[in-house]
Structures are given as C-alpha cells and as structure tokens.
Amino acid sequence: MRLTPHEQERLLLSYAAELARRRQARGLKLNHPEAVAIITDHILEGARDGRTVAELMISGRDVLGRDDVLVGVPEMLDDVQVEATFPDGTKLVTVHHPIP
C-alpha cells in the first residue's frame, strides 16, 4: 500500500486518537497530545460525514471536558486548527477554547 505524506499524517493522527480513546476508556486522564488528537479526529471525521465548518466549530467544544484531561491541559489549548476535507474542498476549522 502506498500512501502520500498527507495520507500518512492522517493515518497517524487517527491511530493517536484511537490510542487516546482506549486510555480514556481505562479511566486515564488525557495529556495535551492525546486531547488534540481526539479533537482533531472528531473534526476530520465530521468533515468526512458532511458536517459544516460551523457545526464542527461548535461540536469540537463538546468532545472533551475538564474531567477528561490532566490539570493544566485546558489552559494550554486556546485553539485547535485543522485543515479538513469537505465535499466542496479543504477548509480550515478553528475550535476556540476546545475544553471549556
């Protein structure tokens, strides 16, 4: 199987999000990279499902809560920005304060 660098990046991100979800299911609090991976995966998959940028900007704030992450992680995440592929092209999705 031959993957472009872009496809390799998406695959790695998807795996990182899956690993973070397994850790979360075991009751572990997520660190910064794990939280970003889950939020980013939510946005990429939402775009693939046909959701709008506006919908993802809102729903991206509901993916994780303060109880899901280690102390200090919400303060480290002011914004999460993801270039996602929508049916009508690639767009930048910004989720402000993704962990309220």
UniProtKB/Swiss-Prot annotation:
This is Urease subunit gamma. Belongs to the urease gamma subunit family. It comes from Mycolicibacterium gilvum (strain PYR-GCK) (Mycobacterium gilvum (strain PYR-GCK)). It comes from the Bacteria. Heterotrimer of UreA (gamma), UreB (beta) and UreC (alpha) subunits. Three heterotrimers associate to form the active enzyme. The keyword Translocase does not apply. GO terms for molecular function: nickel cation binding; urease activity. One of its GO terms (cellular component) is cytoplasm. The lineage of its organism: Bacteria, Bacillati, Actinomycetota, Actinomycetes, Mycobacteriales. It is an enzyme of class 3 (hydrolase). It is found in: Cytoplasm. Transmembrane segments: none annotated. Signal peptide: none annotated. Pathway: Nitrogen metabolism; urea degradation; CO(2) and NH(3) from urea (urease route): step 1/1. It catalyses: urea + 2 H2O + H(+) = hydrogencarbonate + 2 NH4(+). Its EC number is 3.5.1.5. GO terms for biological process: urea catabolic process. The gene is ureA. The keyword Cytoplasm applies. Keywords: Cytoplasm, Hydrolase.
